[in-house]
Amino acid sequence: RSEFLISLNNQFKNEDVLFIGTTGNAAREMYSFMPDTNNFYMAGNMGGALSLGLGAAKAGKKVIVCGGDAEFVMHMGGLSTAGRYADKVDLTYILFDNEQNKSTGGQNTYQNHLGYINIARNSGFEVVNDVVTSVHNFKSTIKDISGLKFICVKCGVDDETPRPPLNVVKTNEFR
């Protein structure tokens, strides 16, 4: 996942785009690998990042939510709600599928049978490519993206990434 996050950092460096990281390793890795973007970390809030992103997108912000497969099913209500606003928001949900719940010990998620892409599509998201597996394809997929989009990135598991300092979690505000 880190190489994809570094790509996002380089592509959206100092741009007016809000990145929301779901709880766990997605947010940890965003903190470590995306220092030049406007990030908000949903520490301790599994399943709320997409809804927060939708609220910010409805207020006129360009939003990219970065999340993992372990929490994807917790966004079901948010997915269908976002789909109702497909023509009114600039919101991209990037699902990083590593088939693990890394932050709680690396348990397998066993969710591939759910069909993430079909769930997103049936909720009203436009799916950009079916599955992205390389940074090169990711760069072209994310370039000039707008509207309500869903991107599924199949990735591996990175080494342990340190937690952000507590003061970052407590004082993080939108810029």
Predicted regions and their residues:
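Glycine/aspartate-rich loop-and-adjacent alpha/beta segment that forms the canonical ThDP
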Residues: R1-E3, F33-D36, D144-R175
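Active-site diphosphate/adenylate-binding microenvironment
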Residues: R1-M46
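Generic beta-sheet signal
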Residues: V17-F19, V63-V65, L91, I145-C155
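General beta-strand structural signal in soluble alpha/beta enzymes
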Residues: L18-T23, Y41-M42, V65, N129-V132, ...
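Glycine-rich beta-alpha junction loops
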Residues: T23-A26, N98-Q100, K154-D159
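Thiamine diphosphate
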Residues: R28-N98
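Long, charge-dense
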Residues: F96-G106
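Conserved thiamine diphosphate
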Residues: Q107-T141
